[in-house]
């Protein structure tokens, strides 16, 4: 059996079982023709072919030759058995059965529902605020006894210098004596009128003999 035939047979079986469970008309083929043949001739023809193939081509289901989409077809295609419930289903509004179950049984009706309590909120302070979110702060009640004087702060005492004053005076005297003993520097010995134009001569003494230890240490780290 091909996969297409298998799914067609499964679809046909499911449609038959669903129809027999929900409808009492007794003939699912007449039901299918009634719903499809008058509006969609191609779908009805396909259903007719499937039915004839499932019947092994040996049984006649009462179909009269003619155009399935034409109103002048078989009587089984255009008429319904007297016990069919299809007309009631066609004229019945959708979800009419469930319209009364949209609300829970304990939900009161609109007339019985209690009106909501409306509380008017004003941005201005009320004259007699009964319930107010931001009440005006009021002074707390104080006793009539005189207020206790505040305790005086401790006077600030400057810390005593750890260096004796005599030692500081002696250091100042030595610095002054050393400053007076130095000879006055003569600018003429260092600079001249042509010092800016003189050629610049350098010697090895002008450079630092030992390199920076930090720089030397960094260079050593890079050596492998």
Swiss-Prot record:
Any coiled-coil regions, as ranges: none
Bias (Low complexity): 185-195
Disordered, as annotated region: 128-224
Record's compositionally biased regions (Basic residues): 139-156
Disulphide connectivity of cysteines: none
Biased composition annotated in UniProt, kind: Basic and acidic residues: 167-182
Biased composition (Polar residues): 129-138
Database matches in Pfam families: TT_ORF2-like
InterPro entries: HEV_TT_vir_Orf2/Gyrovir_Vp2_N (IPR004118)
Protein name: Uncharacterized ORF3 protein
Species the sequence originates in: Torque teno sus virus 1 (isolate Sd-TTV31)
């Amino acid at each position: 059996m091909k996969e297409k035939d298998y799914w067609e047979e499964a679809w046909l079986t499911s449609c038959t079982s669903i129809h027999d469970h929900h409808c009492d008309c007794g003939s699912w083929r007449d039901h299918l023709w009634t719903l499809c043949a008058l509006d969609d001739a191609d779908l009805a023809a396909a259903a007719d072919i499937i039915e004839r193939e499932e019947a092994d081509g040996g049984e006649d289901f009462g179909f009269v030759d003619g155009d399935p989409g034409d109103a002048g077809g078989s009587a089984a295609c255009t008429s319904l058995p007297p016990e069919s419930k299809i007309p009631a289903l066609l004229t019945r509004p959708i979800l009419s059965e469930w319209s009364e179950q949209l609300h829970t049984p304990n939900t009161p009706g609109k007339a019985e529902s209690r009106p909501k309590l409306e509380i008017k909120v004003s941005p201005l302070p009320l004259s007699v605020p009964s319930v107010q979110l931001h009440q005006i702060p009021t002074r707390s009640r104080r006793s009539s006894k005189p207020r206790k004087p505040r305790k005086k702060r401790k006077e600030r005492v400057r810390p005593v210098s750890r260096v004796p004053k005599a030692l500081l005076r002696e250091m100042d005297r030595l610095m002054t004596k050393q400053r007076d003993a130095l000879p006055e520097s003569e600018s003429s010995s260092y600079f001249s009128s042509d010092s800016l134009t003189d050629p610049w001569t350098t010697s090895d003494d002008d450079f630092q003999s030992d390199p920076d230890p930090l720089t030397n240490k960094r260079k050593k780290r890079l050596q492998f």
